[in-house]
């Protein structure tokens, strides 16, 4: 994912910064504790599409 694109995207819940995790193809919002999936290069930025982040993931 291009950095300039990532700079524009924000978490739809918190409006905060997102982290790109290439290995999992996800965008993480640490504030909302949610991981938004990226499918075929398209980020799905809907709260109901996100999975909750576990405490172990947040501490890493």
Swiss-Prot record:
<protein>
    <recommendedName>
        <fullName>UPF0434 protein NMC0623</fullName>
    </recommendedName>
</protein>
<comment type="similarity">
    <text>Belongs to the UPF0434 family.</text>
</comment>
<dbReference type="GO" id="GO:0005829">
    <property type="term" value="C:cytosol"/>
</dbReference>
<dbReference type="InterPro" id="IPR005651">
    <property type="entry name" value="Trm112-like"/>
</dbReference>
<dbReference type="Pfam" id="PF03966">
    <property type="entry name" value="Trm112p"/>
</dbReference>
